[in-house]
């Protein structure tokens, strides 16, 4: 049993609560607030990203590969340095660190500048095929100067009319199409994914 502030939850209940909060918070971030706002007066309501049939299908797909999945609480770089040397040749590491500019407002465990520097140093020196996504800001461009980058924009899936967020994709030891095509929800289209070369 896991103790909350005033209730006890077993692991399944706690896992579902975390899953529900992720799917009903803006961009999956608790501090981002509830989709539609507390008054639910927005165009999109609390359940905009909680499409049950789709989520059940995703969970089943993950469950089908559970023997290939390991969950760890290790720091991302510690994990990569530990398992990286033993990874298969055709393996891709993907890092999605906390945003540089708004990280402290969005995440409880946001990075300090030194943490971002450590990631950049790792990226510049690793032999692993590596993708990193960040907010596109001067500080990140400076940290990753000299590395291959691709700038792109995402349209948030809960509101197509919302302004685009400027992002940057940093890549090391991998060749990427000039302009990856991102589909709704932020995934690379299959045609672009097929052209990524290790």
Residue ranges, per PLM feature:
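SAM-dependent nucleic-acid methyltransferase catalytic core
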Residues: 1-94, 98-104, 137, 165
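Class I S-adenosyl-L-methionine
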Residues: 74-92, 99-198
């Amino acid at each position: 049993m896991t103790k909350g502030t005033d209730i006890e939850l077993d692991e399944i209940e706690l896992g579902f609560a975390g899953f529900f909060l992720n799917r009903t918070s803006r961009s999956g971030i608790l501090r981002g607030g509830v989709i539609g706002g507390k008054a639910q007066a927005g165009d999109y309501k609390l359940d905009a990203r909680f499409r049950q049939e789709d989520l059940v299908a995703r969970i089943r797909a993950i469950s089908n590969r559970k023997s290939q999945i390991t969950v760890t609480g290790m720091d991302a770089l510690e994990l990569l340095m530990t398992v990286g040397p033993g990874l298969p040749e055709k393996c891709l590491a993907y890092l999605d660190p906390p945003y540089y500019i708004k990280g402290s407002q969005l995440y409880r465990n946001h990075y300090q500048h030194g943490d971002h520097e450590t990631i950049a140093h790792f990226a510049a020196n690793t032999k692993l095929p590596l993708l990193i996504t960040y907010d596109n800001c001067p500080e990140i461009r400076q940290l990753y100067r000299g590395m291959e980058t691709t700038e792109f924009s995402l349209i948030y899936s809960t509101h197509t009319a919302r302004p685009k967020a400027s992002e940057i994709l940093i890549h090391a030891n991998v060749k990427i199409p000039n302009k990856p095509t991102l589909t709704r929800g932020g995934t690379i289209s299959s045609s672009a994914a097929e052209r990524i070369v290790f």
